């Protein structure tokens, strides 16, 4: 499908519980439409809404199910899996969904953390519709994500950190050499006006002052920010290259690092190979080995602390 004007689609990527909902809602400050068919709000989880298109969410869930993968699995999605999805009716459904929305709006925003892992599929759809994608990668302290998932899903911290790695690295790899920006959730909560101006300057977007005031004064609510990472980084981020990845992304979120620079890409590739070995069984073994090492370190630290009292 060809269009006379290139449409601008803004896609929020990132791990679950990383502030993707707040970042998606922020797009309205730039008069980016989010549609009106969202999955329902869950009190106590996302009281102010997930801002996820219901149809796109449903399609993503169905595609993962077709691959026998759940959102909380670290099983790698392979190129052959993407090819399989593209050859199924999923592709035509995705085209129809986006064509309908982009036909109505010049600028549209979508969000579903699953997009981070299914992005290669959706990128084929974008190309087929001549849509120009822009990616916002939501960054949140991994400890905060782990604490939030412990409350909501009763996940062990090690599992949550492994998921953070999988989603974050997938978002980084699949958005390479595209129009993208890393946005730190904690910085957005602390100084929303500054972060929104940064986003606007990056894509030459004008701020809607009325929406800006509503978002920064009414929508953002510090009382809903239950979990904040405050421990020294190295004490809870021993799994693989997690500490290094988070540190680089923190710098990218203040424009101190260019993620598309050759040396940075090479480093990210190296980390990606560490957490995403060629074979699924190897990947699981690697994660289990890291998790086991974390557990042993904690056990030793606990015994030493007990001996000092």
What are these regions (language model features)?
Residues 42, 141, 190, 214-215:
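Positions that flank functional sites
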Residues 39-40, 138, 210-213:
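Proline- and acidic/polar-enriched loop/turn elements at helix boundaries
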Residues 1-5, 172, 201-309:
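PAPS-dependent sulfotransferases, especially Golgi type II membrane carbohydrate sulfotransferases
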Residues 6-16, 21-30, 34, 109, ...:
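Structured catalytic/translocation cores of nucleotide/phosphate-coupled proteins
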Residues 90-209:
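PAPS-dependent sulfotransferase catalytic domain
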Residues 1-91, 220, 285:
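PAPS-dependent sulfotransferase catalytic core
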Residues 58-63, 154-163, 230-237:
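A polyampholytic, Gly/Pro-enriched intrinsically disordered region
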């Amino acid at each position: 499908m060809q269009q006379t004007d290139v449409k601008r689609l803004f896609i929020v990527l990132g791990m679950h519980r990383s502030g993707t909902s707040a970042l998606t809602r922020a797009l309205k400050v730039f008069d980016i439409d989010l549609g009106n068919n969202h999955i329902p709000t869950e009190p106590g989880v996302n009281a102010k809404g997930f801002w996820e298109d219901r149809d796109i969410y449903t399609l993503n869930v169905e595609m993962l199910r077709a691959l026998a993968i759940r959102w909380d699995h670290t099983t790698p999605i392979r190129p052959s899996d993407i090819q399989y999805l593209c050859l199924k009716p999923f592709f035509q459904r995705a085209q129809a969904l986006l064509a309908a929305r982009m036909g109505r709006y010049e600028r549209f925003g979508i969000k579903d953390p699953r997009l981070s892992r299914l992005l290669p599929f959706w990128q084929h759809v974008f190309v087929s519709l001549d849509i120009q994608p822009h990616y916002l990668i939501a960054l949140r302290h991994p400890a905060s994500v782990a604490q939030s998932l412990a409350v909501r899903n009763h996940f062990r911290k090690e599992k949550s950190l492994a998921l953070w790695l999988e989603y974050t690295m997938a978002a980084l790899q699949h958005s390479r050499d595209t129009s993208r920006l890393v946005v730190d959730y904690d910085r957005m909560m602390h100084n929303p006006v500054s972060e929104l101006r940064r986003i606007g300057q990056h894509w030459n977007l004008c701020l809607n002052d009325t929406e800006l005031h509503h978002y920064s004064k009414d929508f953002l609510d510090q009382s809903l920010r239950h979990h904040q990472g405050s421990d020294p980084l190295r004490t809870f981020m021993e799994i693989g290259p997690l500490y290094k990845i988070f540190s680089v992304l923190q710098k990218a979120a203040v424009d101190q690092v260019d993620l598309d620079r050759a040396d940075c890409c090479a480093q990210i590739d190296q980390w990606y190979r560490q957490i995403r070995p060629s074979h699924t069984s190897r990947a699981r073994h690697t994660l289990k080995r890291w998790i086991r090492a974390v557990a042993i370190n904690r056990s030793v630290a606990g015994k030493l602390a007990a001996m000092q009292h």
